[in-house]
C-alpha cells in the first residue's frame, strides 16, 4: 500500500478535531512545501524520531550509453538522501516481525 498526500489529509481530519478537509489538505501541502524549499535552499532537515533528509554532492563520473556502449560523462549533481532514525527502523522491524 502507498500512502498519498490525500490520505494523509484524511487521517488529519479523522484524528484532529475541528480540522476541515480543505484545511488538512493545505496543512499537508504546506508541510511538504517547507521540506522542498528548505532542501532547495541547501539546508538539511532533521525530524526527531523519523529521520534526516541530507544533501550530497556527487562528482562527475563516466557512464555508458547502454545501446551503443559509448562512454558518456555523467555531470556532477546534488542529490537528496534520506536516513531513517533508529526509532523508525526499530518500529518498522517490529511491525515486520509481527507480520511473519
From Swiss-Prot:
It holds the Pfam family Bac_DNA_binding. It comes from the Bacteria. One of its GO terms (biological process) is DNA recombination. Keywords: DNA recombination, DNA-binding, Transcription, Transcription regulation, Translation regulation. InterPro entries: Hist_DNA-bd, Histone-like_DNA-bd_CS, IHF-like_DNA-bd_dom_sf, IHF_alpha. Heterodimer of an alpha and a beta chain. SMART domains: BHL. This protein is one of the two subunits of integration host factor, a specific DNA-binding protein that functions in genetic recombination as well as in transcriptional and translational control. CDD domains: IHF_A. Residues 53-72 are annotated as: Disordered. The keyword DNA-binding applies. GO terms for molecular function: DNA binding; structural constituent of chromatin. GO terms for cellular component: cytosol. This is Integration host factor subunit alpha. Belongs to the bacterial histone-like protein family. PANTHER family: DNA-BINDING PROTEIN HU, INTEGRATION HOST FACTOR SUBUNIT ALPHA.
Amino acid at each position: 500500500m502507498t500512502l498519498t498526500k490525500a490520505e494523509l489529509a484524511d487521517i488529519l481530519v479523522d484524528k484532529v478535531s475541528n480540522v476541515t478537509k480543505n484545511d488538512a489538505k493545505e496543512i499537508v501541502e504546506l508541510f511538504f512545501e517547507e521540506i522542498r524549499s528548505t532542501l532547495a535552499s541547501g539546508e538539511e532537515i532533521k525530524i526527531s524520531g523519523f529521520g534526516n533528509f541530507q544533501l550530497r554532492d556527487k562528482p562527475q563520473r563516466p557512464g555508458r550509453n547502454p545501446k551503443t556502449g559509448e562512454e558518456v560523462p555523467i555531470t556532477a549533481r546534488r542529490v537528496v538522501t534520506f536516513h531513517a532514525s533508529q526509532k523508525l527502523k526499530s518500529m518498522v522491524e517490529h511491525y515486520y516481525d509481527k507480520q511473519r
